[in-house]
């Protein structure tokens, strides 16, 4: 067994909820290490929709996923968190007691952590795209076939075919329309699950001749060396080729919770039940914040994860500093907090 990394808190997941938890913990002099299976911070915001606008973050009329992540990283910089990317938590050992919990965490990369608290901020777990059943599609992935839009510039002046009928398909149809050479939206029927205003906007573009809507299913691909030239659509009137340089199938995501499912956390439909006072699980010292948790009235919003992290930090302090009284302070008026943030 290698030498363990000793820290106050291990945070599983470096999405917005996990990042903001670092801030709230840092204000209380609590050190943290973050572990994430992705290669960079930001979770779904950075991995699935870095350039997609978000409209319900307080104080930001509009901010895209990557901008939000960048701002969170700047906000937590004074607390010098340590990140461990490309790793999954494989095993958790409970070492302490309910009154004085402690844990040993093992990762897929062979690292070992010992901490007093574990905060699970893993979103929905590890998300993997559902792939369309098209023979040979793997040969075009990462060059011409994408399951998420990470850089809009990759689609500029291209013939883009988007497949799907939900919010992601419609949102990216509308967002990419101004820069793509031509957008074709493909859905198996003329009935969409997306927000009505998005569907109406799409239909207006189709009626004006600015994009195409085709009904049917993509059955094969044309191209070579990973570069698409066309897709074959099978509809009610037979098969037809559609010019295509970028194919974006939005068939949804599958969620894999992974080893967290074996931690004895009384899972409910792959979510972790918590109390709403401190967002602690049934295991003392293990907290869950963000989309991974569930409780009556839960809203899966980024701002909910921020709120949950702030309240969780108060209880975490009791575990990390059991003999130290916590006095609540405001960053607007506390000189000690401002000193931690480097603003005075």
Swiss-Prot record:
Cofactor notes: Binds 1 FAD per subunit.
EC number: 1.18.1.2
A Gene Ontology molecular function term of the record: flavin adenine dinucleotide binding
Presence of the UniProt keyword NADP in the record: yes
Chemical reaction(s) catalysed: 2 reduced [2Fe-2S]-[ferredoxin] + NADP(+) + H(+) = 2 oxidized [2Fe-2S]-[ferredoxin] + NADPH
PANTHER family in the cross-refs: THIOREDOXIN REDUCTASE 1-RELATED-RELATED (PTHR48105)
Assembly information from the UniProt record: Homodimer.
Family affiliation: Belongs to the ferredoxin--NADP reductase type 2 family.
Protein name: Ferredoxin--NADP reductase
Organism: Beijerinckia indica subsp. indica (strain ATCC 9039 / DSM 1715 / NCIMB 8712)
């Amino acid at each position: 067994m290698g030498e363990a990394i000793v820290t106050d808190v291990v945070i599983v997941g470096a999405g917005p909820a996990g990042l903001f938890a670092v801030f709230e913990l840092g204000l209380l002099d609590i050190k943290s290490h973050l572990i994430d299976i992705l290669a960079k911070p930001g979770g779904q915001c950075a991995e699935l929709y870095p350039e997609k606008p978000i409209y319900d973050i307080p104080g930001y009329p509009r901010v895209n996923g990557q901008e939000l992540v960048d701002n969170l990283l700047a906000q937590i910089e004074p607390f010098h968190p340590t990140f461990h990317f490309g790793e999954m938590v494989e095993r958790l050992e409970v070492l302490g007691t309910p009154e004085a919990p402690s844990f040993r965490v093992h990762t897929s990369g062979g690292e070992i952590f010992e901490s007093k608290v574990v905060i699970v901020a893993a979103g929905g777990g590890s998300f993997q795209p559902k792939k369309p059943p098209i023979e040979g599609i793997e040969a075009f992935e990462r060059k011409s076939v994408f399951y998420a839009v990470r850089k809009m510039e990759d689609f500029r002046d291209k013939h883009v075919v988007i497949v799907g009928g939900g919010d992601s398909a419609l949102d990216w149809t509308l967002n990419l329309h101004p820069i793509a050479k031509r957008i074709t939206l493909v859905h198996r029927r003329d009935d969409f699950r997306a927000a009505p205003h998005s569907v109406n906007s799409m239909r207006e573009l189709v009626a004006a001749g600015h994009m195409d809507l085709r009904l049917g299913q993509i059955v094969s691909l044309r191209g070579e060396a990973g570069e698409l030239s066309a897709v074959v659509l099978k509809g009610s009137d037979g098969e037809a080729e559609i010019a295509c340089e970028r194919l974006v199938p939005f068939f949804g995501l599958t969620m894999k919770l992974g080893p967290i499912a074996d931690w004895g956390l009384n899972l409910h439909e792959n979510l972790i039940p918590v109390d709403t006072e401190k967002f602690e699980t049934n295991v003392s010292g293990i907290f869950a914040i963000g989309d991974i948790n569930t409780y009556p009235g839960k809203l899966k919003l980024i701002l909910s994860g921020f709120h949950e992290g702030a309240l969780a930090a108060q209880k975490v302090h009791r575990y990390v500093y059991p003999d130290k009284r916590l006095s609540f302070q405001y960053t607007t008026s506390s000189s000690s907090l401002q000193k931690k943030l480097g603003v005075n």
